[in-house]
């Protein structure tokens, strides 16, 4: 009876069963196909740095002669372009092309680049500029060009004292980096650190600051006292750090531009581990006395202290 019933149902629903089996086959095929797409084996990334031409900044003979006496540099335009080139190279995202391959002079390229010449050397972007020295001020103009599209992407100018020529190079790099990548540049930044010198038995520690590329080192303390844990404020104009005052660890505040420093607060115990608040208006530090430690804040405007 069971066999007869089964055969009867199969005959009656044969067309439906075939349709049902088709759905099952399609479903199984879909699962197999999806699984095949998911199985991806990534072994490494592939990043091709952007070929970019950094043309030496042009400079007229009068400006160059005056700057040679002031800065003791043979050609300040070339020096600034070297800073830009080195910054782009170290970022890993750009491939500065050799100047030996350039087909156009810097002064002409800044006014009107021959894009076909730059395309021949495989450049996709071009930086040009010029330097003017007038009234004891350094004026630096630069332009960023899209070689493939044959158009200008950016044009800016900066005026500063001649000794800031390296920083101008960092600022130019920041602008170019942001325009081409969409991310903020980090080249016009400085590093605060503790410099050590002297024999092993008598090390001298000084608070020091330098550009992110290791140049323009400046010592902020004389090395008479131990210094530790320096930290910038958000504007990078002030530094807080740990040193000693009357043989006790104290938190100090230092203005980088003026060199003025002061002890933060008058506490009976010792203060250490200073940090600036995110808005830079307060200093957060640890205060220890009689074996107990607490965290305090000091408002830098009214000097109000809170635990």
Residue ranges and their predicted role:
Residues 191, 239, 280-284:
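Hydrophobic beta-strand positions that form the internal "hydrophobic ladder"
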Residues 148, 211-215, 255-259, 299-303:
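Short loop/turn segments that connect beta-strands within beta-propeller blades
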Residues 43-114, 127:
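Short beta-strand->alpha-helix linker/helix-N-cap micro-motif
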Residues 185-187, 234-235, 278-279:
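Residue-level detector of Asp-centered blade-edge/turn motifs that repeat once per structural unit
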Residues 184, 196-206, 222-224, 242-251, ...:
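A flexible loop/linker signature enriched in serine peptidases of the S9 family
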